[in-house]
Amino acid sequence: MPTKARIRLWSTNIENLNFVVNQIKTLAQKTGVEISGPIPLPTSRMEVPVMRLPHGEGKKKWEHWEMKIHKRIIDIASDERVMRQLMRVRVPDDVYIEIELI
């Protein structure tokens, strides 16, 4: 029987990600279960160069667009009561969450 739940969170907006992480931490502190984390993982950075002039005449000038993806991992004891409350946590649209029982 699994005794821990691993919660993976990722988002492009770090403020919303930290908001959800703080909600999970306060939930664990209120219920008194053991929590490990949040463990920050390396930030993925994607860069897309785009040519400013689409017709290609003149000098080639480039704009660089980038997107950063911030990730966190939290390990929490998988008590049934805690898991039910965890499902009720408000998660913004740009924060993605994945729960795995280990």
Curated annotation (Swiss-Prot):
Indicate whether Ribonucleoprotein appears among the record's keywords: yes
What is an example of a GO molecular function annotated in this UniProt entry? structural constituent of ribosome
Q: What does this protein do?
A: Involved in the binding of tRNA to the ribosomes.
Provide the protein name.
Answer: Small ribosomal subunit protein uS10
Under HAMAP family, the record lists: Ribosomal_uS10
- Gene name as annotated: rps10
Name the species this protein comes from: Sulfurisphaera tokodaii (strain DSM 16993 / JCM 10545 / NBRC 100140 / 7) (Sulfolobus tokodaii)
NCBIfam families from the xrefs? uS10_euk_arch (TIGR01046)
Instruction: Spell out the family assignment given in the record's similarity comment.
Output: Belongs to the universal ribosomal protein uS10 family.
